[in-house]
Regions:
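A generic structural motif
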Residues: 77-91
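A short alpha->loop->secondary-structure connector
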Residues: 68-79
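"Short basic amphipathic alpha-helical interaction patches in structured regions
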Residues: 62-69, 145-146
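Active-site environment of non-heme Fe oxygenases that use a 2-His-1-carboxylate facial triad
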Residues: 1-31, 36-37, 44, 49, ...
Length: 210
């Protein structure tokens, strides 16, 4: 916490957009060690990590995003969240919009099915982070499932269906692409590479893809 406070104090006196910051710009060895622990949890552990106890009540939203941005870069390489404008940090806020093609579920108040974020993208990110600045008055609960555990259950109860998950499906791309590109991608839910099992799943986008 001391490193966070010292960094914010220095940055507040040297105005710079947080997106222009790099971990090499700050001296935060303990914070960097935390990032390594997070990365290990994501790649070698359960596949998710919750970081709490950050003094968000003592920070402005901009300061919180600054710390989040630095931590994200220490964990991995950030990528754009929207194709249309290259936005690097994307706000998840209920805008009262109805769900449908071209409308992300995270701007609606509808319950989402289990999915991997950005599954419609040609190259989805390795990890996804969420910074909670203001918990919802009601709802907004997050659910997490470990796909390796799902695979173990399927191997016991539905082993013949597993091979289908390694075959391609059509995914609707949510209009996150050039007008000249195809509106769907054809890719498997499961694949494997040198880093292990890769998962790309969204029931709604698969339905829309067909």
């Amino acid at each position: 916490l001391k490193e966070i406070n010292n960094t914010l104090e220095i940055l507040d006196s040297n105005s710079l957009p947080f997106l222009a910051l790099s971990p090499t710009d700050v001296d935060m060895p303990c914070f960097r060690s935390l990032a390594w622990q997070i990365r290990d949890a994501l790649t070698k552990g359960l596949g998710f990590c919750i970081v709490d106890r950050l003094p968000l009540n003592d920070m402005s939203n901009c300061q919180a995003k600054t710390i989040y941005w630095l931590l994200a870069q220490m964990v991995g390489r950030p990528v754009a969240q929207k194709w249309s404008d290259g936005r690097m940090i994307y706000s998840v806020t209920d805008l009262g919009k109805p769900s449908g093609n071209g409308v992300r579920p995270d701007v609606t108040n509808e319950e989402q099915s289990f999915h991997t974020d950005n599954s419609y993208n040609v190259s989805p990110p390795d990890h996804v982070g969420l910074l909670c600045l203001q918990p919802a008055d009601k709802g907004g609960l997050s659910r997490i499932v470990n796909m390796v555990s799902v695979m173990e259950c399927m191997n016991e109860e539905y082993p013949r269906l597993i091979s289908r998950l390694f075959s391609p499906y059509f995914f609707d791309r949510q209009r996150e692409h050039s007008v000249l590109d195809k509106r769907t991608i054809f890719t498997p839910i499961l694949s494997e590479d040198a880093d292990g099992l890769r998962v790309r799943v969204s029931r709604n986008l698969i339905y829309q893809g067909y």
